[in-house]
Amino acid sequence: MGVCTIFRWLFAAYLLSSYKSLPGAYFVRFYYYVIQNLFLPMFTGFETENIKKLEKNEYGCFSYTSLDTYASPFECDFYFHKSNSTYFAELDISRGNLMCKIFQKLMLNSKHYPYIPVANVFTNFLKEIKPFQKYSVSSRIICWDEKWIYVMSRFTIKKGTVLCSLSLTKYVLKDGRKTIKPKDALEYCGLYNEKVAKISEDNLKLLTERCGFHETVPLENLSQEYCSEI
């Protein structure tokens, strides 16, 4: 085997290891969850297992999604760790899956798909993620108010024991130009009750009075005992 052949194989392996950075890869990864949660049920039935599971759980609105991946070479910067800018692509995928699942019933039964634009994002970078290092991204709703839904995402390594980054995202539910109140959306999905309302109220107070989009330590230690994976 010649040197050129070896080089070609090594280069091919390098490209394969960076599949997340290939043209179009982002759209494939993002729309995989959109198709899975919103388009396939059109053929398999609107009463999905996800909807049934959430409705049976009194804390269903606080369920989380988890994405397992790794830092590919093209995602790393000149400091030889995952570039800060690449965190947001993973956030799109993780949060997109979460919102499609939590509000799946609303979206499937609406005449027009409501959409959920991002209003604000804050990310606190705590520890580096090295090239080829495996990590997980988990996202869950932590609270809401009359208009906004607040989602917390955690980047962790070593099976969730080490927090590398924490992100807060502010969402709004829209039906055309009309804003859908989070409470109304959760009630429609069968996920609203007094217990989750109290948790949301406490977390919102923590977010606005002790944290905001600048200090995240109290949120890093936020209880997850009532959260389950979906």
UniProtKB/Swiss-Prot annotation:
Keyword Transferase belongs to the record: yes
EC number: 2.3.1.-
Cellular component terms per the entry's GO annotation: endoplasmic reticulum
Single GO term (MF): transferase activity
Domain of life: Eukaryota
Membrane spanning residue stretches: none
Swiss-Prot/TrEMBL keywords: Transferase
Top-level enzyme category: transferase
Pfam families, A to Z: 4HBT_2 (PF13279)
PANTHER family in the record: PROTEIN THEM6, PTHR12475
Note from the entry: Present with 1950 molecules/cell in log phase SD medium.
Family membership: Belongs to the lcsJ thioesterase family.
Name by which UniProt lists this protein: Probable thioesterase YBR096W
Organism name: Saccharomyces cerevisiae (strain ATCC 204508 / S288c)
